């Protein structure tokens, strides 16, 4: 393998794993943890409040390892994934390395569309300092390229053509 920056940025041997899936049943409602979800190219996550509203932000993902970092920054033992308002928690793969790339989770193919920046709700959900603790740890947004079922334990891999 070449050591050019382009080659290094396109080589992601790690495989991640889906640790948690959450759906928002209504605006400002708590996320509901589920074992599996159907994902559609046009609608995004079925039964999610944001379903069909934004093609660039159909799915939000965050790293389990970042939840652990945020918890430490806030002096907490753990952070409940639903407090971050993200749909999917994954572990074992650097989501930032997936920027501008397509990746596969189970049957589903997603494409990163940007960073998922924290909002003011983080102060409300995580407590004082929650917004700043989440900065740089908010995960990514993605659009759906190929729909299907996504479930707990599914592997997360860079899509190779």
Each PLM stretch: what is its role?
Residues 1-161:
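Metal-cofactor-dependent catalytic cores
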């Amino acid at each position: 393998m070449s050591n050019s920056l382009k080659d290094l940025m396109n080589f992601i041997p790690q495989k991640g794993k889906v640790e948690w899936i959450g759906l928002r049943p209504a605006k400002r409602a708590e996320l509901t943890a589920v074992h599996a979800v159907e994902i559609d190219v046009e609608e995004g996550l079925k039964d999610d409040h944001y379903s069909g509203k934004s093609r660039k932000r159909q799915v939000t993902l965050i790293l389990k390892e970042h939840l652990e970092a945020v918890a430490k920054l806030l002096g907490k033992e753990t952070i409940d994934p639903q407090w971050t308002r993200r749909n999917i928690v994954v572990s074992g793969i650097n989501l930032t390395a997936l920027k501008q790339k397509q990746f596969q989770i189970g049957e589903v193919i997603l494409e990163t569309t940007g960073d998922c920046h924290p909002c003011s709700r983080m102060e409300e959900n995580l407590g004082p300092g929650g917004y700043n603790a989440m900065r740089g740890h908010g995960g990514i947004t993605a659009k759906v390229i190929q729909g299907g079922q996504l479930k707990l334990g599914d592997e997360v891999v860079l899509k190779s053509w």
